[in-house]
Amino acid sequence: IAAEGATVTIEEVNYDECVRMAAAEADACERGVIVQDTAWEGYEKIPSWIMEGYGTMASEAAEQLREMAINRPTHVFVQAGVGSLAGAVVGYFTNLYPDNPPTFVVVECAPAACLYKGAAAGDGDPRIVDGDMPSIMAGLCCGEPNILGWDILRNHATAFVSCPDWVTARG
């Protein structure tokens, strides 16, 4: 990114705060645009395009399963940060197998388990985790769910798992 002329900084805040900082920078620029997969009220178009791209990955996985004579997976485990990838994968396979979808298990990093907490609350509302989220799963340390992904996951995921680092370290 720096090689393309962008200013790159390292900030001492969590992912969600960095997203807000980047969005503010984009808003301050005459032709600024933020491109990332976290969606919030009023910022949904670009994240939906990114989720469509993730859906292409799910389509390719489904094709590979068919090539191996697996007509339908029984279970789909998918990692989640903000829930964009997870929402796209769950949405794709739910639409592919509407009468008998697989069991969907959404796996999150324990310190940032906003989707898990939203599901555990049982009221359909997303939950936010803030502050420091120390984990070896740094790319999944996102405490604010993508509202588009959350809507899919809360309606179609079978289970949510809050995964501690020791599980990840064991592979």
Residue ranges, per PLM feature:
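Conserved acidic residues
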Residues: G32-V33, T74, T158
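Generic beta-sheet signal
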Residues: E11, D37, V107-C109, C163
